[in-house]
């Protein structure tokens, strides 16, 4: 029965493999797995059940139980020979952030509450954010990807110039960068890793939402490696709790009016955010905490208490507010989901 023991060992790592049975699949003469007792008018079936390691879940057409048939094939009553898969769990941090806690002046993430947060460094050493959305893909902003590159640069030009870390400074290699086809309006790009990351309590994707969580007053959390009070990049991941703002007030703050012919693009920080139907704003907390340079690419994470799941309601695009301007600007995740899923499926 050594072959079955090998299956269990491999499954503990969240991987599923065909069973190598040797010359005699029916030979149970093994001290570690004695032959089961016989019963009158009955027989013994040889069964295996596939399970996944912690932070993975089984995706199967059947129940994950396979029986050895007369042809020495492991078969499931629904899926036949097709094996199930272990897929990464998303949005289920082992140590979620305390809802009562309150990056310019944010709190330190000491317990890994934001395992989807990645740190990206440009070829000239500038730190930005990225968000893990599967065990092989991340979202970030197009502006982050274009840092120190011309506007005509392609994803192939950009990918080799980036350094990317997940978890506690785990270096990962980038296979490709894919920019949104309308990235001047939808400030987003995708990063594909060369290898899938092992999902742990420190490295876990956040879920993309199927419904819109964005509503004025709704609170989300944003983590990041951006600049702090003294305008230096932090070496500790920080987070802040921010409310979704009234969109019209945000537009007036940056553009002086919601009426197109009356707009005056005079941002209080000297840089204009991209504001359109694909974006939403989040305001300062009462403690005047805010995001800042280097936090872009991070998720506006919202906890769905009914599902006990964390979703990326948006991706931070405009991180220049730094407690000077009143609002950070985010790309709506619901507007990205179709493009993200199609792009991942094709690549």
From Swiss-Prot:
One of its GO terms (cellular component) is blood microparticle. Keywords: Acute phase, Antibiotic, Antimicrobial, Antioxidant, Disulfide bond, Glycoprotein, Hemoglobin-binding, Immunity, Secreted, Serine protease homolog, Signal, Sushi. Disulfide bonds join 52-86, 90-207, 250-281, 292-322. The keyword Signal applies. Expressed by the liver and secreted in plasma. Residues 103-345 form the Peptidase S1 domain. Residues 259-264 are annotated as: Interaction with CD163. It comes from the Eukaryota. Residues 1-18 form the signal peptide. Glycans are attached at residues 148, 182, 264. One of its GO terms (biological process) is acute-phase response. PROSITE patterns: SUSHI, TRYPSIN_DOM. SMART domains: Tryp_SPc. Tetramer of two alpha and two beta chains; disulfide-linked. The hemoglobin/haptoglobin complex is composed of a haptoglobin dimer bound to two hemoglobin alpha-beta dimers. Interacts with CD163. Interacts with ERGIC3. Belongs to the peptidase S1 family. As a result of hemolysis, hemoglobin is found to accumulate in the kidney and is secreted in the urine. Haptoglobin captures, and combines with free plasma hemoglobin to allow hepatic recycling of heme iron and to prevent kidney damage. Haptoglobin also acts as an antioxidant, has antibacterial activity and plays a role in modulating many aspects of the acute phase response. Hemoglobin/haptoglobin complexes are rapidly cleared by the macrophage CD163 scavenger receptor expressed on the surface of liver Kupfer cells through an endocytic lysosomal degradation pathway. PANTHER family: COMPLEMENT COMPONENT 1, S SUBCOMPONENT-RELATED, HAPTOGLOBIN-RELATED PROTEIN. This is Haptoglobin.
